């Protein structure tokens, strides 16, 4: 049963308003279109939309009260009425939202693990949840591929939901028996305070490379946003990738840091490192050493960065006290994440690997990872998103030309931009104009590659991963790389 609280108690940390005790808050809602009879509407000033413009609409929808961000006309602490509905104004409401929602949903008590970084967040959160389930502990995830238990994920609009959604979802998950939840924590989510009131048992840093500069402006601002997971949330354990330049620097600054590396470290360093890594078609075998002792594991994942992902997940769970032998014994039962280095293969045709790689660093790592598994030619099919960072377009084309034997440029959510102009930006990164084929339709691009590839080739279909849509100028249409691979290879879904 959902928790309720009277408005006086809900606002107690910021406002003394005993006259509002007879108003019951049962659900907070940020979107006026979603307000139902008896909901409390929260009107914040967002980065795009000012929720205060929709107060009247929320009241018409049945809001029983409104909590709004203050302004010069309506200062902090003001209580007024509109159509007999109370409106209370708070200063910097956007920064208080996480705590406000936490009070209503009683700050769900479970082990929270926050994972931040440019790449690897989804894989690591899902590996952590899988491993905990295999160890007998009910665990959930929140992130790009959805929220909830792995066998019943509910779609998510953003990597990190809004502050109210997060607290509401955690309360629901706790009610369903979750003992731990692994959350993808995006830089946007950190800057906008969406996880401000959460206390993390562990935080994980994967890596930092070019992404979201259209939002943050500089790499320095992007890095600073990520760092706040460890400096402002009292993480008991900070699991840091030492093989990343930024991670190595942060490790020196964080007292609670546990390092992770694919390379041997000095015994005095508080870290877990690989003493040997073997890659095969059946997966990755890692022997490790360090502050948690020695061990060996095998998991059916492919690619060097998945070796790092495995060790980051392992170090996190060991730091939280999960039995080491139970983790090593169950590693072979771990499964790849949908759309993350996901292999589709049949006899007599090239292998197709679907991956979410949509940044220069991710594309480079994906191609490098597949090269060690590839006995024939390596193909790269990818595009770049419209209305996003244009600077990465030539960079990604240069990487593909350098690391793949064949390059096919295609569309990936062109949005309001002309797809041909996006491709022109990518072509600028090539040293030879004829080193890439252009096919705007993704299905046709994969069909072209399969028609021209040999059986021992590997085709990387990058950019969409788990997504099942293509965002065009005036509409969003259904499209899935995974479904395309299955259809063209004749694999039943």
From Swiss-Prot:
Q: Which GO terms describe its biological process?
A: cell division; cell wall organization; peptidoglycan biosynthetic process; regulation of cell shape
Required cofactor(s): Mg(2+)
Quick one: which residues bind UDP-N-acetyl-alpha-D-muramoyl-L-alanyl-D-glutamate? 30, 32, 158-160, 186, 192, 194
Enumerate the InterPro entries for this protein: Mur-like_cat_sf, Mur_ligase_C, Mur_ligase_C_dom_sf, Mur_ligase_cen, Mur_ligase_N, MurE/MurF_N, UDP-N-AcMur-Glu-dNH2Pim_ligase
Name of the protein described by the UniProt record: UDP-N-acetylmuramoyl-L-alanyl-D-glutamate--2,6-diaminopimelate ligase
Family statement drawn from the similarity comment of this UniProt entry: Belongs to the MurCDEF family. MurE subfamily.
Annotated compartments? Cytoplasm
Q: Which organism is it from?
A: Vibrio vulnificus (strain YJ016)
**Mod. after translation:** Carboxylation is probably crucial for Mg(2+) binding and, consequently, for the gamma-phosphate positioning of ATP.
Please indicate which superkingdom the organism of origin belongs to.
Bacteria
């Amino acid at each position: 049963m959902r928790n309720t609280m009277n408005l006086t108690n809900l606002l107690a940390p910021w406002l003394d308003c005993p006259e509002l005790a007879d108003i019951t808050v049962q659900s907070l809602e940020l979107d006026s279109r979603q307000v139902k009879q008896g909901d409390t509407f929260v009107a914040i000033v967002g980065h795009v939309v000012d929720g205060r413009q929709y107060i009247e609409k929320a009241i018409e929808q049945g809001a029983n009260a409104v909590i709004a961000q203050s302004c010069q006309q309506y200062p902090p602490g003001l209580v007024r009425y509109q159509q007999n509905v109370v409106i209370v104004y708070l200063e910097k409401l956007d920064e208080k939202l996480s705590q406000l929602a936490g009070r209503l949903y009683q700050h769900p008590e479970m082990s929270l693990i926050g994972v931040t970084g440019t790449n690897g967040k989804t894989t690591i959160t899902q590996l952590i949840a899988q491993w905990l389930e295999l160890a007998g502990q009910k665990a959930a995830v929140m992130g790009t591929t959805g929220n909830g238990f792995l066998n019943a994920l509910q779609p998510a609009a953003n990597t990190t939901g809004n502050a109210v959604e997060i607290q509401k979802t955690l309360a629901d998950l706790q009610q369903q028996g979750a003992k731990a939840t692994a959350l993808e924590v995006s830089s946007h989510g950190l800057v906008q305070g969406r996880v401000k009131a959460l206390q993390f048992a562990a935080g994980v840093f994967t890596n930092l490379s070019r992404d979201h500069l259209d939002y943050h402006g500089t790499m320095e601002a992007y890095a600073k946003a990520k760092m706040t997971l460890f400096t402002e949330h009292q993480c008991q354990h900070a699991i840091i990738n030492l093989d990343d330049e930024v991670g190595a620097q942060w490790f020196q600054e964080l007292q609670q840091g546990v390092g992770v590396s694919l390379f041997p470290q000095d015994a005095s360093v508080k870290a877990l490192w690989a003493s040997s890594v073997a890659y095969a078609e059946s997966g990755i075998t890692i022997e490790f050493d360090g502050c948690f002792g020695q061990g060996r594991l095998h998991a059916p994942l492919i690619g060097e960065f998945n070796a790092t992902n495995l060790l980051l997940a392992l170090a996190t769970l060991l730091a939280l006290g999960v039995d080491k032998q139970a983790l090593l014994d169950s590693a072979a039962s771990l499964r790849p994440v949908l759309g993350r280095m996901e292999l589709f293969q049949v006899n007599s045709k090239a292998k197709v690997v679907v991956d979410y790689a949509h940044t220069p660093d991710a594309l480079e790592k994906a191609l490098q990872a597949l090269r060690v598994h590839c006995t024939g030619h390596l193909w790269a099919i990818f595009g770049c998103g419209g209305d996003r960072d244009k600077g990465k377009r030539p960079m990604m084309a240069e990487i593909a030309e350098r690391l793949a034997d064949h390059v096919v440029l295609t569309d990936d959510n062109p949005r309001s931009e002309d797809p041909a102009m996006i491709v022109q930006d990518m072509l600028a990164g090539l040293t030879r104009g004829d080193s890439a084929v252009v096919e705007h339709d993704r299905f046709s691009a994969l069909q072209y590659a399969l028609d021209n590839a040999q059986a021992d080739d590997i085709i990387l279909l990058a950019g969409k991963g788990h997504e099942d849509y293509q965002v065009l100028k005036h509409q969003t249409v259904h499209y899935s790389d995974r479904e395309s691979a299955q259809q063209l290879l004749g694999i039943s879904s």
